[in-house]
């Protein structure tokens, strides 16, 4: 007799009895869009299947890591081989050295790199390193940029320019974030005023160059150029959080795109995750040899981790980076992502629905402006001003038709090398149906 299949609703009800909110990361609960979360049973290529057996074209990609799609043969083989050799040793391995060398070869701004297990850990460590390197305490971050859930970074903007942040989570004492100043993304005037007031006290400026937790918002070239100039002028470090966009938007990550537009541009510290682990828990932060030499065991800035450089995770990451380093990989991925965004835009135009979208490499985002003719949002406030209700309706319209987008207006989407033109066309067809009155 066949085992009865649990429905998504049954599994969610069961999960809520043992897991807070029924999920292990809040966005998965569908609170932003309403409805019942899908419990995924398996995935392959560009597709996922839920507990009820329904198939979806996947544009979440585990929130970015699955740039090759699910179950890529080369990655799977590397992971299986590594697993037979041992899950974890608590000692150095050749493979972690090889992964570090591979990342450094692709990111010229970094001369050394330290592997950790999560993006939160990497961002937290990068801030500690910047403070240790400068002997200063204060930092700038930007509203709408997410850098993990370390206490000092869980901050929303204050009511005025020079107002330091208030915690956005219970359990974070106000004194922990008293050194964190939150500014408006892409606002040069506000940035200059902040440096004028606090320049000598600033350890660093931390930024997502393409903000994936505002959906998809780019830092403008003039804004990034001014950040670099002010950091250099005042002795603060520029920290690039590329956990999401690193090795997603270009082989050299987002910083390579700004280096093309701004002569001599480079961040001082870089944070990576997601793609470098290929779906396994792995992240990293890197900088010049001089800055990285401040880390223990060489220097006074302490950082450690039991599972850092895990041999199975590094095998997964290495195999992934080798595949995306193949000639033409990002050109093909970018063309497919552009095909999707252009198709969605055409579908919305035909339905008379205001729509704007953008993409880079295998990362994309879109918004439903409230007024026709509005351009792409430039900061968190303009993202907030877009039509949340329209997005929620669109999300469910696609979900019902077998297309799985991120269940929140504020999250980016991801295309993988496994997505075919047929998958893109099927998605656009579903969008046309969902946008009908």
Swiss-Prot record:
Pathway: Porphyrin-containing compound metabolism; protoporphyrin-IX biosynthesis; 5-aminolevulinate from L-glutamyl-tRNA(Glu): step 2/2. It holds the Pfam family Aminotran_3. Keywords: Cytoplasm, Isomerase, Porphyrin biosynthesis, Pyridoxal phosphate. It comes from the Bacteria. The modification N6-(pyridoxal phosphate)lysine is found at residue 274. It catalyses: (S)-4-amino-5-oxopentanoate = 5-aminolevulinate. It is found in: Cytoplasm. One of its GO terms (molecular function) is pyridoxal phosphate binding. Its cofactor is pyridoxal 5'-phosphate. Its EC number is 5.4.3.8. One of its GO terms (biological process) is protoporphyrinogen IX biosynthetic process. The keyword S-adenosyl-L-methionine does not apply. InterPro entries: 4pyrrol_synth_GluAld_NH2Trfase, Aminotrans_3, PyrdxlP-dep_Trfase, PyrdxlP-dep_Trfase_major, PyrdxlP-dep_Trfase_small. One of its GO terms (cellular component) is cytoplasm. It is an enzyme of class 5 (isomerase). Belongs to the class-III pyridoxal-phosphate-dependent aminotransferase family. HemL subfamily. Homodimer. This is Glutamate-1-semialdehyde 2,1-aminomutase. It comes from Leptothrix cholodnii (strain ATCC 51168 / LMG 8142 / SP-6) (Leptothrix discophora (strain SP-6)).
């Amino acid at each position: 007799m066949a085992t009865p299949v649990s429905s998504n609703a049954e599994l969610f009800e069961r999960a809520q009895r043992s897991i807070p909110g029924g999920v292990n990361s809040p966005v998965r609960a569908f609170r932003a869009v309403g409805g019942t979360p899908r419990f995924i049973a398996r995935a392959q290529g560009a597709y996922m299947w839920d507990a009820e057996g329904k198939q979806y074209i996947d544009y979440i990609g585990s929130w970015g890591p699955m740039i090759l799609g699910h179950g890529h043969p080369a990655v799977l083989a590397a992971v299986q081989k590594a697993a037979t050799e041992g899950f974890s040793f608590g000692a150095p391995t050749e493979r972690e050295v090889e992964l570090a060398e591979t990342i450094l070869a692709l990111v010229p701004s970094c001369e050394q790199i330290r592997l950790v297990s999560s993006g939160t850990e990497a961002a937290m460590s990068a801030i500690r390193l910047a403070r240790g390197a400068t002997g200063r305490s204060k930092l700038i971050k930007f509203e709408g940029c997410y850098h993990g859930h370390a206490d000092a970074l869980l901050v929303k903007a204050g009511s005025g320019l020079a107002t330091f942040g208030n915690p956005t989570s219970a359990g974070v004492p106000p004194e922990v974030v008293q050194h964190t100043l939150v500014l408006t993304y892409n606002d040069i005037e506000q940035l200059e005023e902040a440096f004028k007031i606090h320049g000598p006290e600033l350890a660093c400026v931390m930024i997502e160059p393409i903000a994936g937790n505002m959906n998809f918002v780019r830092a403008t070239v003039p804004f990034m150029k001014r950040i670099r100039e002010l950091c250099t002028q005042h002795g603060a470090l520029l920290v690039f959080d590329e956990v999401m966009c690193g090795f997603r938007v270009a082989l050299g990550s987002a910083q390579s795109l700004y280096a093309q537009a701004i002569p001599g541009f480079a961040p001082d510290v870089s944070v990576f995750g997601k793609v470098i682990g290929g779906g396994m828990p792995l992240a990293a932060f890197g900088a010049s040899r001089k800055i990285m030499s401040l880390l223990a065991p060489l220097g006074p800035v302490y950082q450690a981790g039991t599972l850092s450089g895990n041999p199975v995770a590094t095998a997964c990451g290495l195999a992934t980076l080798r595949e995306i380093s193949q000639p033409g990989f990002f050109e093909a991925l970018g063309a497919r992502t552009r095909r999707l965004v252009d198709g969605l835009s055409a579908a919305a135009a035909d339905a008379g629905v205001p729509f704007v979208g953008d993409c880079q490499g295998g990362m994309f985002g879109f918004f439903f402006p409230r007024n026709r003719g509005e351009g792409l949002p430039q900061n968190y406030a303009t993202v907030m001003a877009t039509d949340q209700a329209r997005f929620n309706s669109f999300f469910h319209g696609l979900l019902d038709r077998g297309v799985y987008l991120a269940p929140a207006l504020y999250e980016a989407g991801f295309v993988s090398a496994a997505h075919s033109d047929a998958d893109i066309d099927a998605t656009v067809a579903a969008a046309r149906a969902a946008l009908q009155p």
